[in-house]
Regions:
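Transmembrane alpha-helical segments of polytopic membrane transport and secretion proteins
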Residues: 1-34, 109-115, 287-297
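Membrane-water interface segments at the C-terminal ends of transmembrane alpha-helices
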Residues: 28-59, 75-191, 219, 223, ...
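Glycine-rich helix-loop "coupling/hinge" segments at transmembrane-helix boundaries
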Residues: 57-61, 239-265
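Transmembrane helix boundary and interhelical loop/hinge segments in multi-pass membrane proteins
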Residues: 61-64, 142-143, 189-199, 208-210, ...
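A short amphipathic helical element positioned immediately N-terminal to and/or at the very start
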Residues: 63-72
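Glycine/proline-centered hinge or cleavage motifs at structural transition points of membrane proteins
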Residues: 204-206, 218
Length: 297
């Protein structure tokens, strides 16, 4: 009995001794987190820190708030901020309405090729923004297809479609490009909707409008919030559409950054505008997170 007990104690001691080096050799979790954090800091945070630092560095050198005072006092900045906000809000509203209607049709109105259209929405998300703008220029540009058909049919020297070089052209291009970003989460939400609710509502005499308002819309609100917030942030930072439309007098914050940095070589002012743009984007994203958390989305 004593020999057996001694053997058991010896085995336990050997096991504990073998486990001790293994525990001592175990790498803490924070060590594994260092490489990705370092890569993230080097690739993203360091350039942002340089932009912020440059925004406080006037041409004379040193650190000062003068670049912010000069930019905030300029009419070009105020006009760019106003244009950016109203274009972003208008585009987001248009995308929400159009995206909701199109997603409803694709999800609940059976028609040939409906699944192919839903697949195309996924493909559309990968298109660059300038490609959509280029397509609109081919259709509605000064020498586009619509103006060509008009002049060919009427014999006029010029066509009537010249809105692409106005803010309305930018608005149309942004709605065209960003609407699928609203449709995608809506289609995912509609695919999980219990169709028996629609059947029960219809059997109780509810019309299509009431079914949409009472049954479908409440289920779609989280998806609408997600898609709308994404579109709003992307519209605030959109550069390619405004550049490719060549809209006269349409200067957004990203375009102002380009103008200050590339055309005027005023890097301090460009960094100030960039910091403002980043602050607006981060603020909107934080607000979206708070609202979605309270809504339970």
């Amino acid at each position: 009995m004593t020999a057996t007990t001694g053997t058991a104690r010896t085995g336990a001691a050997v096991t504990a001794a073998a486990a001790a080096p293994a525990r001592s050799r175990a790498v803490p979790a924070w060590v594994w987190a260092l490489p990705p954090v370092a890569v993230l800091a080097l690739a993203f945070l360091y350039p942002l820190a340089l932009v912020v630092q440059q925004s406080f560095t006037p041409d004379e050198g040193g650190l000062s708030l003068d670049p912010y005072a000069e930019v905030f006092a300029s009419a070009s900045f105020r006009d760019a901020l106003t244009t950016t906000v109203w274009l972003a809000l208008g585009s987001t509203a248009g995308c929400l309405v159009l995206g909701f209607v199109l997603a409803l049709v694709i999800a609940f109105v059976p028609f040939p090729g409906g699944k192919a259209v839903a697949r195309f929405v996924d493909v559309f998300l990968s298109f660059p923004s300038f490609l959509i703008t280029l397509a609109l220029l081919f259709i509605y540009g000064s020498v586009g297809m619509a103006n060509g058909l008009w002049t060919g049919a009427t014999g006029a020297a010029d066509g009537p479609f010249h809105f692409l070089t106005t803010p309305w052209g930018v608005l149309l291009a942004e709605i065209t490009y960003f609407t699928p970003f609203v449709m995608r989460p809506l289609l995912a939400a509609f695919s999980q909707l219990d169709t028996s609710q629609l059947e029960v509502a219809s059997s109780l005499g509810a019309g299509p409008v009431r079914i949409i308002r009472r049954v479908i819309l409440p289920e779609a609100l989280p998806a609408l919030a997600a898609g709308g917030s994404l579109v709003l942030v992307m519209c605030l930072n959109e550069f390619g559409i405004v550049l490719f439309t060549g809209a006269k007098g349409v200067t957004t914050l990203p375009m102002l950054v380009y103008s200050k940095a590339i055309l005027e070589s005023d890097y301090a002012a460009a960094c100030v505008v960039a910091v403002v743009n980043i602050a607006i984007s981060v603020g909107l994203y934080s607000l979206y997170r708070v609202v979605s958390r309270r809504a339970g989305a």
